Amino acid sequence: MIATVILADSIKEAIEKIKSSSSDLYELRADSLKDYSKLELLEPYSEKLVVTIRSKDEGGFKELSDEKRLELYSKFLEIKPRYVDVEFRSKIKDEVMEIAKRVGSRVILSYHNFRETPPFGVLYNLLEDMESEGADIVKIVTHASSPKDNIRIIRLYEFADNLIAFCMGSKGKISRIFSSMYSPITYVALDKKAAPGQLTLEELRVILKILGEGR
């Protein structure tokens, strides 16, 4: 499935962007919002929503305390989004996963490294640790400093099915393309890119058409 990343100042703007795009899913980067009122307006789109409130340490747009993030996750989970994304290293991980499972939302447990792509052994151990938490999908994203980093991250697909793994940055685009064919969810930009090297929806569709994997 393709998830278009939605960056917006308000819920109203987020809905306008959702309506302007045709996508399987929409990742609402709630950490980009300035106004959290009227969350209930998102309920008609809940089956297509991936709610992410990214921490500043892992690429979030602003500093939010753990208490505030947990409060926001709880409010967003009241509309029962299809997926909720929370960081593996987050102190509120267990609470968010518990609430999500109680309301029937699926959990994406994520790890982001903006500095490097660790050695394969480190990545493999990380994958095992993350899988043991019981999330529906594991997401591992690293920074590519060289083309070889793509190979390390792609190798993870040998050992997991419900995995999203790719490298960020201009040197990581090949892993994003590979991920689009083997991951349960592929992230694309609508207008403003949320991460280095991210493809737009149209760019991805052109690439998949060439590869015979059109969606």
Swiss-Prot record:
Keyword line: Amino-acid biosynthesis, Aromatic amino acid biosynthesis, Lyase, Schiff base
Enzyme class: lyase
Pathway where it operates: Metabolic intermediate biosynthesis; chorismate biosynthesis; chorismate from D-erythrose 4-phosphate and phosphoenolpyruvate: step 3/7
InterPro entries attached to this UniProt entry: Aldolase_TIM (IPR013785), DHquinase_I (IPR001381), Type-I_3-dehydroquinase (IPR050146)
Active-site residue list: H112, K139
SUPFAM superfamilies cross-referenced by the UniProt entry: Aldolase (SSF51569)
UniProt keyword Mitochondrion, yes or no: no
Residues noted as binding 3-dehydroquinate in the record, renumbered to the chain: E27, L28, R29, R54, R176, Q198
Gene3D superfamilies: Aldolase class I
Enzyme Commission number(s) of this protein: 4.2.1.10
Reaction catalysis annotation: 3-dehydroquinate = 3-dehydroshikimate + H2O
Gene Ontology biological process terms from the UniProt entry: 3,4-dihydroxybenzoate biosynthetic process; amino acid biosynthetic process; aromatic amino acid family biosynthetic process; chorismate biosynthetic process
Molecular-function annotations in GO: 3-dehydroquinate dehydratase activity
Role: Involved in the third step of the chorismate pathway, which leads to the biosynthesis of aromatic amino acids. Catalyzes the cis-dehydration of 3-dehydroquinate (DHQ) and introduces the first double bond of the aromatic ring to yield 3-dehydroshikimate.
PANTHER family: 3-DEHYDROQUINATE DEHYDRATASE (PTHR43699:SF1)
Complex and partners: Homodimer.
Family from the record: Belongs to the type-I 3-dehydroquinase family.
Protein name listed in UniProt: 3-dehydroquinate dehydratase
Organism annotation: Pyrococcus abyssi (strain GE5 / Orsay)
